[in-house]
């Protein structure tokens, strides 16, 4: 049986404040912000239909990365890509936008950051 046509739409990040986290990703990526309704705020790529959605939760607990036993674990993380020639500029930009550098880095070709509410994300430098 052939699979029905299902396309990727978005990644949703829980957070304590939609506006603040969306503003961080707008600054980081240069994407546009759009409110779908009272509950959903999106940051949308200008190059495709892909978007990040932000959902406020009253009991938000930031994930701990790397994992620590007994602490909130990450459920997923975002991966972005940039040119190796722009590595230092991209890292400086991410930090200026409000990201922090993760305490553990596993690969030379990728840098792990933590967004303002604790979600880890990577920027890989290939090309």
Residue ranges of model-derived segments:
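Glyoxalase I/VOC metalloenzyme domain signal
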Residues: 1-9, 13-35, 45-100, 114-127
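Short hydrophobic/aromatic beta-strand element in the GNAT-like acyltransferase core
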Residues: 40-42, 110-112
């Amino acid at each position: 049986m052939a699979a029905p046509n299902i396309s990727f739409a978005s990644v949703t990040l829980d957070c304590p404040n939609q506006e603040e986290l969306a503003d961080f990703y707008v600054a980081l990526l240069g994407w546009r912000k759009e409110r779908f309704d009272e509950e959903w705020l999106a940051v949308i790529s200008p190059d495709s239909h892909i978007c990040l959605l932000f959902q406020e939760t009253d009991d938000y607990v930031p994930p701990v990365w790397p994992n620590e036993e007994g602490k909130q674990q990450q459920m997923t993380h975002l991966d972005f890509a940039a040119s190796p020639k722009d590595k230092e500029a991209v890292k400086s930009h991410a930090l200026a936008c409000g990201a922090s550098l993760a305490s553990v880095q596993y690969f030379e070709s990728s840098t792990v950051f933590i967004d303002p509410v604790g979600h880890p994300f990577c920027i890989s430098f290939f090309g």
